[in-house]
Design a protein with these regions (language model features):
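Short beta->alpha connector loops at strand-helix junctions that form conserved
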Residues: 84, 104-111, 204-205, 294
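An N-terminal-biased, well-structured beta-alpha scaffold segment characteristic
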Residues: 1-106, 229
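Short glycine-/small-residue-rich Rossmann-like dinucleotide-binding loops
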Residues: 60-61, 86, 212, 218-220, ...
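Rossmann-like dinucleotide/phosphate-binding beta-alpha-beta segment
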Residues: 26, 147-238
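A short, aliphatic-rich alpha-helical micro-motif
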Residues: 47-51, 72-75, 154, 207-211, ...
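Phosphate-binding beta-alpha-beta segment of Rossmann-like dinucleotide-binding domains, i.e.
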Residues: 101-158, 173
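Rossmann-like dinucleotide-binding domain for NAD(H)/NADP(H)
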Residues: 106, 230, 239-320
Length: 320
């Protein structure tokens, strides 16, 4: 039986991270691959490249917009597109065109969600045990920092999740063995639904003001931009920990920085405004801040898992 054709659009130097030898073999096991993934520029005739293709594998959003609605309509055979690693902006625009051409689009980017959730759990554990702070103290010459009674553990903490979508729910799942209380806010999630993953739904004001650890998991939309206000930030408990692997646009970033400078709470952050932050940004000097350079969802293993997850979704849709 003739195997279905799968078109892999260009993503340039990212290609081997998602489509390594193992994943390429996995895809070739059930399909004929039309592979433009390593290209840095759009192919000269995208419609020609799509001839006879039944499905698109979109490794990330770098070249997604090369595939236009007109090209898809001209070809007429593409019926499925699976996203390996969703890039907001480029994918949002591209998939609107794909859907308009009658293509069914599936987001299979769970690998990225898993990576961010694991980073978040690691940040929480780092924060309660003050790993980074103690490391800095010992490197600075403190022979044996006495922090026995300032370090803590997750057990007994109230953890507030702001955003209960994919990542928020994964974080809630990872926290289950730790004997924590989990509260959460999401405008589009009901209290009944939240309870199914052991989260007690609370208003945003309550989550921000009463949690020992706050973790942000909202996407950036017109509704969520600066949703977390100065009042919310100033209500955070003294000494609490805020973890941000989402985006800075969802909070009042100026108020966030001011409160950190005053030492009102602690933060572990993977996102900044702008990115990267200037080398002389005072945030880099705050002792109550731990920073990573936007890597929560960008690891070598994450790329492999994203590729694998999308390929297996394609297999399911194309051959059952």
């Amino acid at each position: 039986m003739e195997r279905p054709k799968v078109y892999v659009h260009r993503v340039g130097s990212w290609a081997p991270r998602y489509l390594d030898d193992e994943n390429r073999s996995r895809l070739a096991d059930f399909s004929e691959i039309v592979d433009d993934s390593s290209l840095d520029a759009p192919p000269s005739n995208i419609a020609h490249r799509l001839e006879g293709v039944q499905a698109i594998l979109s490794l990330n959003g770098a070249g997604a917009e090369d595939i236009t609605e007109d090209a898809l309509r001209a070809v007429g055979t593409v019926r499925i597109a699976v996203i390996s690693h969703w890039f907001h902006g480029s994918h949002d625009r591209a998939t609107a065109a794909w859907r308009a051409a009658g293509v069914r689009v599936t987001d299979a980017s769970w690998g990225n969600n898993f990576a961010v959730a694991q980073w978040t759990l690691g940040a929480m554990i780092n924060g309660v045990f003050r790993v980074a702070e103690l490391d800095r103290a010992m490197r600075a010459g403190e022979v044996w920092p006495d922090h026995h009674f300032t370090s803590s553990m997750l057990d007994g903490q109230r953890i507030g999740l702001v955003g209960l979508g994919r990542i928020g729910r994964l974080v809630a799942g990872l926290l289950q063995p730790f004997h924590v209380e989990i509260v959460g806010y999401d405008k589009y999630v009901t209290a009944e639904e939240a309870s199914k993953f052991n989260v007690r739904w609370c208003p945003l004001e309550q989550v921000m003001a009463t949690s020992d650890i706050i973790s942000l998991h909202l996407p950036v939309t017109p509704e969520t931009t600066r949703l977390i206000t100065r009042a919310h930030i100033e209500s955070i408990r003294k000494g609490a920990l805020l973890v941000n692997s989402a985006r800075t646009a969802i909070l009042d970033y100026e108020a966030f920085r001011e409160c950190l400078q005053k030492g009102l709470f602690r933060a572990i952050v993977d996102v900044f405004e702008p990115e990267p932050p200037p080398v002389d940004d005072p945030l880099r000097t705050f002792p109550n801040v731990v920073m990573t350079p936007h890597i929560a969802g960008s690891t070598a293993r994450m790329c492999h898992v994203c590729g694998r997850t999308a390929i297996e979704e394609l297999r399911k849709q194309l051959v059952g």
